[in-house]
């Protein structure tokens, strides 16, 4: 995706998919949405994959999913890379792509199985329904989780430990330097 120059994982996925009979169009690194869209329209893929190694790539993937959704696409989108996770995909990504399905693929060795599940006309609906149910469950757990109320920075600063002569002496009185 745009902003990410890392390509090792993407390259491994491409090789694994090609070795298993899939036709792959590898767009390279630093790929913006317009290039992705142009290739979707030209190549007519069954599945789209996005990969990212750095944290800003997650926001770029979310933006791409939102645009794909707005543009009316419903292609399955595979998400992978070091910064991605099942929870992040369910909580932050999937809600931006309501017309399609977003699948977190944590390892290149799993991509062929996921693609076969998604492309199997007899079982893909069940696979997608189960995946979306799992993502909805993850989202529900997230929304119901205990919220941490952080203290405002000014309040935290006002409660900082204040050193003075008495508390310094109390802290050091049992510490014998001569031993």
Model regions and ranges:
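Cofactor-cradling patches in redox/metallo enzymes
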Residues: 10-20, 24-96
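C-terminal interaction appendages of subunits in large macromolecular complexes
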Residues: 72-76, 102, 139
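Short acidic-hydrophobic, aromatic-tinged amphipathic segments that line or gate anion-handling sites
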Residues: 100-107
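Active-site loops and adjacent core secondary-structure elements that bind or stabilize anionic groups
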Residues: 107-179
């Amino acid at each position: 995706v745009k902003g990410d120059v890392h390509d090792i994982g993407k390259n491994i996925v491409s090789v694994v998919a090609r070795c298993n009979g899939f036709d792959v169009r590898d767009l390279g690194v630093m790929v913006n949405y317009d290039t992705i869209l142009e290739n979707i329209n030209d190549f007519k893929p069954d599945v789209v994959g996005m990969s990212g190694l750095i944290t800003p790539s997650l926001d770029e993937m979310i933006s791409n999913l939102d645009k794909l959704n707005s543009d009316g696409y419903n292609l399955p989108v595979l998400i992978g890379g070091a910064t991605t996770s099942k929870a992040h995909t369910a909580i932050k990504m999937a809600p931006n792509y309501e017309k399609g399905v977003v699948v977190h693929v944590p390892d290149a060795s799993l991509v062929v199985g996921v693609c076969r599940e998604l492309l199997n006309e007899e079982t893909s609906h069940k696979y997608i329904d189960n995946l979306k149910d799992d993502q909805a469950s993850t989202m529900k757990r997230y929304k119901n989780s205990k919220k941490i109320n952080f203290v405002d920075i000014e309040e935290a600063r006002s409660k900082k430990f204040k050193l003075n002569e008495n508390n310094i002496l109390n802290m050091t009185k049992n510490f014998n330097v001569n031993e």
